[in-house]
Amino acid sequence: MQNKNDIITENTYCSPLHFNYMKSNGPTQNDDLVESMQQIESAILIGGWKKTKLWWELVSLMKSPSDYEIVRRLWLASPKSCRENLSVLRAVARAACISGEHMEGRTILRKAIIIAANKKRKQKSYLFKGKRYVKSMLKKSEMTKNQNTDSFEMHAKKALHDLNVVLEDFGVKTFLISGTLLGFVRDGAIISWDKDIDVGVFSEECTENIENLFSSLSNFNVRRLDLSSDRVRVTHETGVGIDIFPHYMEGGRRWHDGAATRWWNTPFSLKKMKFLGVDQWVPDNPELYLDENYGDWRVPEPNFDARLDAPNVEITDQDYFDSLIYFALLKTIVNDKQKMKHRYISLLRQLGETTWLSRI
């Protein structure tokens, strides 16, 4: 039986995280934003400490570095059980880093990395229960993976169509970029390990803030991805996330920004091609775009890191760039990517990290 605080928390801000609630009650003005953050803070304080979606929604509402104070205040007041929750740790670390508090963020990430490594060791110790069991689980995993890919492509087609309808009404064309363009050109499909869609827009076509274009729509939820760039993520009602990267001209090149890096391309125009059965804009010379972004893109490389490996990358925020290596290490441990794990450990050692890395 739920106690009173659990019921209040669930009714106050678990249902808000349902897509339809987020659209009907999402903040559009500064006063609404402050009120929304205060509502989430209250929901966490009365018992929602381990409800990770609350923490992530709070972080997604941050509009300036000063908003980190709410997250920090909650973190300092949180119980021990909350401080061992990997998703909460990652959310708080992200809030710290996007606010420029990198030392705080890295301290939290070190703890998260050690916890994740310990959990992974325990999971592996349970795995060795006989070859037949392991083989069976791997087969089931592959079947589920194929089913998930088919489902994602179906939802992605709908999400991309609806996105284009919205933006074309404002004279804005979306075009495939990054991993989505790579999958289209090389494989004729979405890359199997991609979990979202990447599109670009020309900044000169965006006469209005992209967030504002989606704020009143019932089938999309929109959030800025960080405080240092204009890129946004729109989440379709199907659950598909689409990252939108404005491409702007500077120094005779087209650039688009990430959190701590940016990438250049030779200026290009657009052409339409069939993607997932629908017409979609792509760079007029997609192979050149991919050459500049990936180098040898014709051979699949699951361990490619666009911040480290892209031939056209430029670091714009060294502190944040270094912090992202901690996030990357945490992700590789959770996903059991051994090759990349050792790569990020080596990079952290170059940054001066020593003793604690031996524990992972």
Feature roles, as predicted:
Residues 83-94, 98, 102, 106-176:
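Helical scaffold of the NTase/Pol beta-like nucleotidyltransferase catalytic core
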Residues 49-79:
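Alpha-helical adaptor scaffolds
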Residues 47, 78-82, 115-119, 351:
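Alpha-helical junction/boundary sensor with strong preference for TPR arrays
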Residues 26, 60-61, 94-95, 331:
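Residue-level signature for tetratricopeptide repeat
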Residues 148-164, 168, 214-281, 288, ...:
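Conserved catalytic core of two-metal-ion nucleotidyltransferases
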Residues 164-197, 204:
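Active-site nucleotide-donor binding segment shared across nucleotidyl transfer reactions
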